[in-house]
Amino acid sequence: TNLKDARPELYGKLEAENKPEKALVQEGDMYSFHAVDRMFKEQEWICPINIEHQDNAFYSISRNQITIPEKAQFKDGESWYGTAFHEMVHSTGAEGQLNRLKPQSGFGSDEYAREELVAELGSALVCQKYGMTKNLKEDSAAYLKSWLGSLKESPSFIKTTLMDVKKATSILTQRIDEVSLEMKEQQSEDVAASVSEENKDAKDMKQSASSNDNEQT
């Protein structure tokens, strides 16, 4: 069973609250999400994000930092952003944030499995919100199914997990939306400044032409 089959009403509620909005721009064979790209470049997330040419994506609890491979190592931009969102959801559980992570929880433990569910479902929902659904739904479904198989499903477990997913994705989407709004406002200011400069140039040219006419004999 997967999460959608186990509690369809709760899954449906989360989906309804995360209606897709197109944020990707296709650039060649890759997709780009400019707000998230700026967050990475300017280090505007709650912890440092290192992009390196290597094969692993992970969040280090002890160092409170994320490491992800380069975008070019992925088949498309959607998969890369989905991987980044997975690790960013992990980072929301750090001490001083949502205090969800337990450093002593080793691979294979119930706590580890539950955190992977939070991160992967959170990633899938963030991707869905911004219109990235095609590739990630299949990957996420397989991921969620494998981890749910290692846990005893119960209504309380599913409910508390979804609550953590909602809290984590709220932090992530709120920051993305803030950066996106800042970029739009800056773009509007740039356009307004450009129009103002063009109007000034036109006015100067008109005044110059008028002066020349007055000087003619």
Stretch-by-stretch model annotation:
Residues 1-75:
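Contiguous, non-catalytic segments that form substrate-binding/exosite surfaces or channel walls
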Residues 66-72, 101-108, 147, 151:
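Glycine- and acidic
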Residues 77-81, 115:
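Alpha-helical scaffolds flanking conserved acidic
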Residues 82-95, 119:
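Active-site recognition of the HExxH zinc-binding catalytic motif
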Residues 92-117, 138-144:
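Post-HEXXH active-site segment of zinc metalloproteases
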Residues 111, 124-191:
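Long, well-structured alpha-helical subdomains associated
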Residues 116-126:
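Hydrophobic/aromatic-rich, well-ordered segments within soluble, folded domains that form packed cores
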Residues 192-193, 197-198, 203-217:
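Non-Sec secretion/translocation targeting segments of pathogen effectors
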